[in-house]
């Protein structure tokens, strides 16, 4: 038994998990929000629905999104017209696209992260990958590992159909992997392409219209590991703690169903209030052990589900406007990219901190929180410690 205890100690890292590199990627097709209603109603052959188009234009303006990147183009939609219907059975057409394109876009983000990390791909020991779409066997994790040329010994984990909170949740998983496997280097990748949720407009389906107005495509990747090699690996953040909380009796707040016509989503109008009203408890649980009880004393890397959610959090927790400014900026420039979004926010924060001459990667502060919100209702809270700049 003594030998077993010694072996277990030897298997563990000495220090905390750190985020060593960040990479992001989007499809090349940029859509300005101001002209998106014209594009959307044209490609879905819905220009006869002028009143609905006016309503959709107001919805697009209200999102506060300025532009988004999408895989779908007018050419692709002409080749696959079923995608433009409201609820015509079209799963096979959609699946044919995402099975190929999700790993490809993920590869772009992963390669950027690996390049910043500065070590050979052969030294990646674990791959954790999530996407709401593209369920297949072998999965997108296998396809990505093959595209990247990762070693056959890499330990893969694929997570499907989990949505917006999963970017934060994967950091919780990566922390445990890195700290319990000495020398582990975990490539964490989130990639979301909205092909399975794109569809034509319908007067009675507000949720579907809201999705067309706010969702974007993107991929984010990070490399996580403990005990960084001096002079080679340069941590950006330490992962001090990570935890999940499910809000009681909230399964109807937000979610989705996979059908023959793709993904259909639902959400309550009260969703921003539900998140804001319950977030304080999660923050208390995460930050109290550090002696932090003032939410303005930490930096924020929050998933911006929509503008109303950001507003509700800011008001309920009495945050100064700068705390969620990075989340607002990313949402404005990219829309809601579901699980990948939080990696864009984290990347933007560390870059902004450097450009503005802050003393740390966390806007000059030592401690911060990375937050994800998703179906469940699930609240993911990751405590980050910034690094000096």
UniProtKB/Swiss-Prot annotation:
Acyltransferase is among the record's keywords: yes
Catalysed reaction, written as an equation: (E)-feruloylacetyl-CoA + (E)-feruloyl-CoA + H2O = curcumin + CO2 + 2 CoA
Tissue specificity annotation: Expressed in both the leaf and rhizome, with higher expression in the rhizome.
Temperature dependence: Optimum temperature is 50 degrees Celsius.
One Pfam family per UniProt: Chal_sti_synt_C
Reported pH dependence: Optimum pH is 9.0.
Keyword list, A-Z: Acyltransferase, Flavonoid biosynthesis, Transferase
GO molecular function: acyltransferase activity, transferring groups other than amino-acyl groups; curcumin synthase activity
InterPro entries for this protein: Chalcone/stilbene_synt_C, Chalcone/stilbene_synt_N, Polyketide_synthase_type-III, Thiolase-like
GO BP of this protein: flavonoid biosynthetic process; polyketide biosynthetic process
Metabolic or biological pathway: Secondary metabolite biosynthesis; flavonoid biosynthesis
Broad enzyme group: transferase
Enzyme Commission code(s) on record: 2.3.1.217
Active site: 164
Outcome reported for the amino acid change (mutating residue 211 to F/W): Strong reduction in enzyme activity
Record note on quaternary structure: Homodimer.
Family as reported in the entry's similarity comment: Belongs to the thiolase-like superfamily. Chalcone/stilbene synthases family.
Function as written in the Swiss-Prot or TrEMBL entry: Catalyzes the synthesis of curcumin by condensing feruloyl-CoA with a diketide-CoA in the curcuminoid biosynthesis.
Protein name stated in the entry: Curcumin synthase 1
């Amino acid at each position: 038994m003594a030998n077993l205890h010694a072996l277990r100690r030897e298997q563990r890292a000495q220090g905390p998990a750190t985020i060593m590199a960040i990479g992001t990627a989007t499809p090349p097709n940029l859509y300005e929000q101001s002209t998106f209603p014209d594009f959307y109603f044209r490609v879905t052959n819905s220009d006869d629905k002028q009143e609905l188009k006016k309503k959709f234009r107001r919805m697009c303006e209200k999102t506060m999104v300025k532009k988004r990147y999408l895989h779908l183009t007018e050419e692709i939609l002409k080749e696959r017209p079923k995608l433009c219907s409201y609820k015509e059975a079209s799963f096979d057409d959609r699946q044919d696209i995402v099975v190929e394109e999700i790993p490809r876009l993920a590869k772009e983000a992963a390669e950027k992260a690996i390049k910043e990390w500065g070590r050979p791909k052969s030294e990646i020991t674990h791959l954790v990958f999530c996407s709401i779409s593209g369920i297949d066997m072998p999965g997108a994790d296998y396809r990505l590992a093959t595209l990247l040329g990762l070693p056959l010994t890499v330990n893969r984990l694929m997570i499907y159909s989990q949505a917006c909170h999963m970017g934060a949740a994967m950091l919780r998983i990566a922390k445990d992997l890195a700290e319990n496997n000495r020398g582990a280097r975990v490539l964490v990748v989130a990639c979301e392409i909205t092909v399975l949720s794109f569809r034509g407009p319908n007067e009675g389906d507000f949720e579907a219209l809201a999705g067309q107005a706010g969702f974007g495509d993107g991929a984010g990747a990070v490399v996580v590991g403990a005990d960084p090699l001096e002079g080679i690996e340069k941590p950006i953040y330490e992962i001090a703690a990570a935890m999940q909380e499910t809000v009681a009796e909230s399964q109807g707040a937000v979610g989705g169903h996979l059908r023959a016509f793709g993904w259909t989503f639902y959400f309550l109008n009260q969703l921003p209030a539900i998140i804001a009203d319950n977030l304080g408890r999660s923050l208390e649980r995460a930050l109290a052990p550090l002696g932090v009880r003032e939410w303005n004393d930490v930096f924020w890397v929050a998933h911006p589900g929509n503008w109303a959610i950001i507003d509700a959090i800011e008001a309920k927790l009495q945050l100064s406007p700068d705390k969620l400014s990075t989340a607002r900026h990313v949402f404005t420039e990219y829309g809601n990219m579901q699980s990948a979004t939080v990696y864009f926010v984290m990347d933007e924060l560390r870059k902004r901190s450097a450009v503005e001459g802050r003393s740390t990667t966390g806007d000059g502060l030592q401690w911060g929180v990375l937050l994800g919100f998703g179906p469940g209702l699930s609240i993911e809270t990751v405590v980050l410690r910034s690094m000096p700049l």
